[in-house]
Amino acid sequence: KIPAWWAMCLGIAFGSFASYALSVFHTKYLIALDPTFDFQHLIILLGVINGTAYAGGAFFGARLADKWGSKDIRAYGWVPAIAISLCLPTGIGSFWVSSIEVNLLLSTLFLLFVGIYLGPSFAIAQTLAPINMRAMSTALFFFVLNMIALGGGPTFAGIMIDVFKENYNDLDSMRYAMSLTFCIFVPSIISFLVVARVLPKDWAAAEQRNKELADG
């Protein structure tokens, strides 16, 4: 009944599909890329990058969406769409570089970009839901997100790695599999563009509906 809500939900689910797959196979890929790299040092670097870049992207995305959204509500769809558009080449490129250092640099940018859609998406989830159903809205949001992204992302990437391994070595099979997995960003981008198109109408309707509910 709320097109922007469902489009947002699919947008973040497809976007997280790729990022969850990366989180599962990234370390395995880096070890295959350079087996001589100090593993303990690598794990520390990955921890710092994941903890700072992703959080930074979430904060930056929320601030940017609120700033632009105060002038045009469609920014809550545009900001995630732009960020995920940047994730696509950055993610694929990170798997085709020849050194761990360059991969970590691109991965930092990737995590920064992929964190940007969180703030706008949660804003949409809470704003568009009736005030007497916001807890259920969040629960349904996470159900769809985890069914598609957490359940599908790592599974799909793992299957593709096994498929490509029939003709390629471990390193290249992960490169081809993850490049294919990152293509799921395309429907995510489309979903957020749909959000931008239908959000003004749904946002106005939600504000009116919630005002009526609040007034009793």
Task: Locate each region found by the language model.
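Residue-level signature of the transmembrane alpha-helical core
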Residues: 9, 13, 47-51, 81, ...
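Loop-to-transmembrane helix entry/capping segments in MFS-fold secondary transporters
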Residues: 39-43, 131-141, 174
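Hydrophobic/aromatic positions within or immediately flanking transmembrane alpha-helices
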Residues: 43-47, 74-80, 104, 135, ...
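Extracytoplasmic gate region of multi-pass secondary transporters
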Residues: 2-62, 91, 114-122, 149-161
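C-terminal transmembrane helical hairpin of 12-TM major facilitator-type secondary transporters
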Residues: 71-121
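Multi-pass alpha-helical transporter architecture, strongest
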Residues: 88-97, 179-215
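Paired intracellular helix-loop junctions of major facilitator superfamily
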Residues: 69-71, 125-134
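A membrane-interface helix-boundary motif in multi-pass transporters
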Residues: 38-39, 75-78, 161-185
